[in-house]
């Protein structure tokens, strides 16, 4: 294993822990770190309000940010390797737009429930997660199909963008014919946040995210084989079609779960894999996958803290913060593309 990677594991672990605990203390209501630690250790606090803020609000929010960041970053890495394209990602290729369309159909047209169409009523966040998953997987399936037809990566990106425009067009029509309350709910969901997962919903969200992340870890060997090209991967015994389907499923789980609960989050899935590659100087997925997960969690936790305006109760939308960190990385990657190791 790369010796440099061995240094990044503990370093990222310390940064992750610091951002996690810092996020519990920092907010519209500042809470001293010693009180935060007492609350986490079960000792409680003489201020009940602080205890409720930490346990009921900030702790689920921090765990959500940790898992969502890892999920989006891993999803972006899988797509970049699958398409051998450094600009591939859930948002760029229209996958997030597919999830948005599914959620829009549920929230704007069906009113957040599928119960009237099924014997088993599915309502609330269950309907949203199902709709996001189906929407994301449909778009992913289309991208995989077109990737077999179009060999030029730039053309494939354009197709993904066009699919995103089509999804946005349908969403606009649904918005036009929906009630004000439903449109407002959808717009608020679309701003992105990590506070949409309650303590009761956290086990479901965490289980879905961890399943996707575990599946990504199991894909490390096939991903490394794909770096050599599909022909060489097939000669190494990798079943290309099955590997594509598994990557499709894994990316669908990670993207749909995060998008359903947190809204469409930009740049994390696109930028974080590049940050990990720049740190490691390697595209070996044995070290790249875990470092990407850790880096994604750190970036998401940092964004979660930056959303809070100091000295003010205002909370910025998540998608107003992520481009500040992600856009400079992508610009740097484009400018220095020839000097960065991608798929070798």
Task: Tell where the protein language model's regions lie, with residue ranges.
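Alpha-helical transmembrane segments in inner-membrane proteins
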Residues: 1-344
């Amino acid at each position: 294993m790369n010796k440099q990677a061995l240094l990044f594991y503990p370093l990222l672990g310390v940064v992750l822990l610091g951002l996690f605990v810092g996020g519990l203390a920092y907010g519209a209501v500042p809470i001293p770190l010693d009180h935060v630690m007492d609350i986490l250790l079960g000792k409680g606090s003489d201020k009940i309000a602080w205890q409720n803020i930490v346990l009921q609000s900030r702790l689920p929010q921090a765990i959500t940010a940790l898992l969502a960041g890892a999920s989006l970053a891993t999803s972006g890495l899988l797509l970049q390797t699958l398409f051998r394209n450094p600009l591939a990602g859930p948002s760029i290729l229209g996958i997030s737009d597919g999830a948005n369309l599914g959620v829009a159909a549920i929230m704007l047209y069906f009113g957040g429930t599928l119960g009237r169409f099924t014997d088993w009523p599915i309502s609330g966040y269950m309907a949203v997660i199902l709709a996001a998953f189906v929407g994301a997987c449909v778009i992913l399936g289309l991208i995989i199909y077109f990737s077999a037809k179009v060999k030029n990566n730039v053309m494939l990106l354009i197709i993904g963008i066009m699919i995103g425009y089509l999804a946005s067009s349908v969403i606009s029509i649904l918005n036009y014919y929906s009630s004000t309350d439903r449109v407002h709910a959808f717009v608020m969901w679309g701003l992105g946040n990590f506070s949409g997962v309650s303590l009761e919903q956290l086990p479901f969200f965490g289980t879905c995210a961890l399943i996707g992340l575990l599946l990504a870890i199991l894909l490390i060997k096939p991903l490394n084989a794909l770096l050599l090209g599909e022909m060489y991967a097939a000669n190494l015994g990798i079943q290309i079609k099955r590997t594509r389907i598994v990557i499709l499923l894994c990316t669908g789980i990670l993207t749909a779960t995060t998008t359903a609960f947190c809204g469409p989050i930009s740049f994390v899935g696109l930028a974080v894999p590049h940050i990990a590659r720049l740190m490691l100087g390697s595209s070996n997925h044995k070290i790249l996958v875990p470092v990407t997960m850790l880096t994604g969690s750190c970036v998401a936790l940092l964004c979660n803290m930056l959303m809070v305006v100091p000295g003010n109760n205002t909370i910025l939308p998540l998608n107003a913060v992520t481009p500040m960190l992600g856009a400079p990385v992508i610009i740097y990657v484009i400018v220095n593309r020839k000097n960065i190791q991608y798929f070798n």
